[in-house]
Structures are given as structure tokens and as C-alpha cells.
Amino acid sequence: KEILQIQTTGLIARLEHINCKKAVLGISGGLDSTLALLVTVMAFDKLGIPRENVIGITMPGLGTTHRTKSNAVDLMEVLGVTTREISVVAAVEQHFKDIGHDPKVMDSTYENAQARERTQILMDIANQENGLVIGTGDLSELALGWCTYNGDHMSMYAVNASVPKT
């Protein structure tokens, strides 16, 4: 509970400092994006900003399971945030064609291209909405470098950056 309060207080300070009334998050259905979404909703509630101003986006890709996608959508609906679904499959497949990468080769190019496409979507929607991209990566991922450069390591405010994955 104390960690949630610290995260919420930090996000509130940032939102107030830049006079921001909207947030954009990529929601995967995993622990990190769930925590980031909960903190964002708590911050918006404390600021009296409608939850609809929190834009949660699930971005199914080439390896997305029904379970994680369902978890993401269910969580966003229960919390009453704006829910969007944008598939990255067509864009990533086109990218693979453009660079000559075989999509059957599931290497770092395969994984990282999807993360980068998702980040581009989040940044573009934040620009459209005059919102803040809330990062979901945690301290353990940042410390170990377990993220995609120009992908999920990028955000406008990394709300989980001080929280280890435990």
C-alpha cells in the first residue's frame, strides 16, 4: 500500500506540474501494466479527473494469447477507463517485408519490432490526445536491461521505475 501511495503521489506531482489531464498506457494483461494502470487510476481519482481520460490500449501482436488480451480488456472495463484495441500485426508484417526479415524467425528482431511498433502507437495517441505516456517497465527490467531500446523502455513518465519485480 505504501508503494502504491508513493507511485500515485509522484504521478500526481508530474501531472500537476505539466497540467496534463490525460494518460495513455499500453495494457498487456501482465503484472507491470496492471500496476501502472492501477496507479494511474488512483492518481486521476485523487485529482478529480474522470477515469475516461485514462486511455488503455491493448495491442495484440504475433504472439498474443487470448488469456492475456482478455485480462487486459477485462481490467480496463472494470476500472472504467477508455479502452482501445489496436493490432500491431499488419504494421509489423509490413515492416518485416520492408527489411527482409522472415516472420518465422522468432529472434530479437521479431520481438523488438513489435515492442517498437507498440511504443510508436502510444506516443502518437498521446500526441493526438495531449496526454502523457505512462511507462510500465519496472526497476528489475531497467536494471537488467530487459527491455527494447526505442520500445518499451521509452515513456513520458515511468511510474514503475522504482519498483522491483517481486
List where the protein language model places each region.
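Glycine- and acidic
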Residues: K1, I18-I27, G56-T58, D102-S108, ...
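A glycine-rich phosphate-binding loop feature that marks nucleotide/adenosyl-phosphate handling sites
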Residues: K21-S33, V89-V92, D138-S140
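Beta-sheet entry/capping signal
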Residues: K22-V24, N53-I55, T82, N130-V133
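Short glycine/threonine-rich loop-to-helix capping motif typified by GTGT followed
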Residues: I27-T40, H66-N71, D98-I99, T148-G151
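Active-site adenylate/phosphate-handling loop in enzymes that bind or generate adenylated species
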Residues: F44, L79, P103-T166
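A conserved beta-strand->alpha-helix junction
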Residues: I49, N53-T109, A115, E141
